Amino acid sequence: MSGRGNLLSLFNKNAGNMGKSISSKDHEIDSGLDFNNSESSGERLLSSHNIETDLITTLQHVNISVGRGRARLIDTLKTDDHTSNQFITSESKENITKKTKGPESEAIASENGLFFPDLIYGSKGSSVNIYCNYLKLTTDESKGVFNYEVRFFPPIDSVHLRIKYLNDHKDKLGGTKTFDGNTLYLPILLPNKMTVFISKAEDVELQIRILYKKKEEMRNCTQLYNILFDRVMKVLNYVKFDRKQFDPSRPKIIPLAKLEVWPGYVTAVDEYKGGLMLCCDVSHRILCQKTVLEMLVDLYQQNVEHYQESARKMLVGNIVLTRYNNRTYKINDICFDQNPTCQFEIKTGCTSYVEYYKQYHNINIKDVNQPLIYSIKKSRGIPAERENLQFCLIPELCYLTGLRDEVRSDNKLMREIATFTRVSPNQRQMALNKFYENVSNTPAAQEILNSWGLSLTNNSNKISGRQMDIEQIYFSKISVSAGRSAEFSKHAVTNEMLKVVHLSKWIIIHLRNYRQAATSLLDNMKQACESLGMNISNPTMISLDHDRIDAYIQALRRNITMNTQMVVCICHNRRDDRYAAIKKICCSEIPIPSQVINAKTLQNDLKIRSVVQKIVLQMNCKLGGSLWTVKIPFKNVMICGIDSYHDPSNRGNSVAAFVASINSSYSQWYSKAVVQTKREEIVNGLSASFEIALKMYRKRNGKLPTNIIIYRDGIGDGQLYTCLNYEIPQFEMVCGNRIKISYIVVQKRINTRIFSGSGIHLENPLPGTVVDQHITKSNMYDFFLVSQLVRQGTVTPTHYVVLRDDCNYGPDIIQKLSYKLCFLYYNWAGTVRIPACCMYAHKLAYLIGQSIQRDVAEALSEKLFYL
């Protein structure tokens, strides 16, 4: 254990303050929502700060029989007694060593898989009071969720009929139930193990047998509890969009843009270390006040020839709302060969859409020549028996939801929208209290919860957290404190970079009328380079007469030589097709670092200096240089990041990006991307990328790493089993038994919010705040980390799930390392929300998936060419 303790001490300024790293312990309701092998000078500087790397080697001798962190996930509502797809383990029950204390907490094999019976907490850092957006749920011991199997004699295939006949006896079942056609859930225990009812079905006597199976454990009931809260929100007259609920009675109007913002909530019930709780966060939905028909008319007037193609491109895949029933539908297609006068079948015969809407909704269709919107929905019931329900909707009755591309690109409009959607910590707490009051003061909502023995309390959202120490940032010759704000932008542009690559052979391509902008760029670059320690020579200037894409392509092909280090393109404006064409040439056809600059950013005399400073920093990274680092006292450890990109249209390829550190200061990265032919999050080709990265690490360092830490982004809770059983073994096959792996899933899209301060005045926690108790999952090794400073709105923490910790680092080291890595993203002189390796993987995957759409030349793999 001494090796681990010595390593941990290097993370703290004062080793004498060390402690244990693991503790064993019409609607009127107000919503309340108004490449260089040599060691750089920066690395030598780290060595001079008493980094006793020889102590770290003792980590290699700390072993545990089974890898830590193999979390047993929460079963779904219909989990069988015997779970499938158990976590991989090579040891039997008898061979598992039981630890009684220390970081290698007890791990045992049970009938439900491998899990951690001990609570895994860190202890380093100063204690802080934290508030969270969780409400405690208590259960009535006299009630519960009782599982029954229902059989019909003679058998009935139709789920609809099964539900109908069982409903004939609902008064005998207590009036409250959940039934999917096979399994019945009741909040009461029936007096007999088997209960038999008789129903009449077309002169045939139908026997219904209800057989008691078991009382469900709390962790198996969370799906039901979430269904109950969906019913509660419906009682409160909220409209459901996906998993979120919105209040249509209090929209915030943006008249000039013809938009309205609906306030709402997103709720989720789960079992946490603090018990059964409801996570409740504020949410908003943007709704267009223009109908889809108005949008179609605009498109037709803009381009008659390509009208249908443009309409499908803009609308297919979007979600629309029909206000006559407040339901949402996804647009799967537009039927230009049909209109509202077309006939379709209903129970009473055939009717037209015009007649149907007049009869059932009292709506007069005005335009009888408009096309129809085609939508598909899955029917409810047993998944295996669900059918596709097809709908044809009327465009003049449909309203687009969400943010369109033209809205996102309008900065002024986005700032106006943010005035409604950017919610402060105090406002979130007020909204949480208002939600509790609305549920508590609505008898129908209380009846839904009470019938299942549930009650909501509002006294459990104060928890404890920890604040990590302030980090030191290391440049080539000096180190500076990042401060509590974890920002150091002034120091980043006034100190020599950690590793400098001088620029002597390079090209600037610009339009002829942007000659002055190119000259201004060069002059400001030379000024910026003086303080950054970078020498820059005059470039070859290439003037273009036209802004056509082929002009840039020809200029690149004609002027790039073997000695060219970098090419800079100054473009008239931002165009995705031009940008993609330039990147395809420079990343695949003629591999060379490239920088694309919008000429408008060079024409503001007040901002040009800061803009060019950032450009120089980017260019140094793309050339293979590094900007700064932090002290990470590991020896012979490789850190990796993984993320993926999916085509939003769901029809294109997917890209999986893999990034791995290749030097001891974690300032140089090997990057590789795999283009996949079908949409999948769990990547098949990771092992090949991993193997190449190991070879590159050995080439740079003379040996393979002893330990590997992998941060995996883009994985939800539902994919953790698959990740553990399918993705991690790919790395193990490459490593064998020689290298230990710690595998950490990084989750950004979460609804957890944490606040600091008193109950009266709440604010965002400072960077470095970690929470690993109370609101973490009951059966996972996980924690929440706030790494960014957010001055407007509410900060969103990042959720880390440790699936494996075979390196035996324990929670304190993993938490501290995760925070340190957030300082190393070179596009921002401060902390980012996730570790830099994941940010680099995200940038790489996005560039290839969005623009390049092909493999990148291996010559660029050791440079951050995608920044």
UniProtKB/Swiss-Prot annotation:
Gene: AGO3
Annotated spans, Necessary and sufficient for interaction with krimp: 1-83
Domain PAZ, chain residue ranges per copy: 291-402
EC number annotated for this UniProt entry: 3.1.26.-
GO CC annotation: cytoplasm; cytosol; extrinsic component of mitochondrial outer membrane; nucleus; P granule; perinuclear region of cytoplasm
Subunit (UniProt): Component of the ping-pong piRNA processing (4P) complex consisting of krimp, aub and AGO3. Interacts (via N-terminus when not methylated on arginine residues) with krimp (via non-canonical tudor domain); this interaction leads to symmetrical dimethylation on AGO3 arginine residues and its subsequent dissociation from krimp. Krimp associated AGO3 is mostly free of piRNA binding and the interaction plays an important role in the loading of AGO3 with piRNAs; piRNA binding may stimulate dissociation of the two proteins. May form part of a piRNA processing complex consisting of tud, aub and AGO3.
Protein family: Belongs to the argonaute family. Piwi subfamily.
Any single biological process term in GO: spermatogenesis
Protein's UniProt keywords contain RNA-binding: yes
Interaction with papi, as annotated region: 1-289
InterPro entries reported for this sequence: PAZ_dom, PAZ_dom_sf, Piwi, RNaseH-like_sf, RNaseH_sf
Keywords assigned by UniProt, alphabetized: Cytoplasm, Developmental protein, Differentiation, Hydrolase, Methylation, Oogenesis, RNA-binding, RNA-mediated gene silencing, Spermatogenesis
Protein name according to UniProt: Protein argonaute-3
PTM annotation, UniProt: Symmetrically dimethylated on Arg-4, Arg-68 and Arg-70, most likely by csul/PRMT5/DART5. Methylation state probably functions as an indicator of its piRNA binding state.
The keyword rRNA processing appears for this protein: no
GO terms for MF: piRNA binding; RNA endonuclease activity; RNA endonuclease activity, producing 5'-phosphomonoesters
Organism: Drosophila melanogaster
Sequence positions bearing Symmetric dimethylarginine: 4, 68, 70
UniProt note on tissues of expression: In ovary, expressed in germline stem cells, germline cyst cells, nurse cells and oocytes during early stages. Also found in the somatic cap cells of the germarium. In testis, expressed in germline stem cells, primary gonial cells and early spermatocytes. No expression detected in the somatic hub cells at the apical tip of the testis (at protein level). Expressed in neurons throughout the adult brain and in the mushroom body subdivision in the peduncle. In the mushroom body, expressed only in gamma and core alpha-beta neurons.
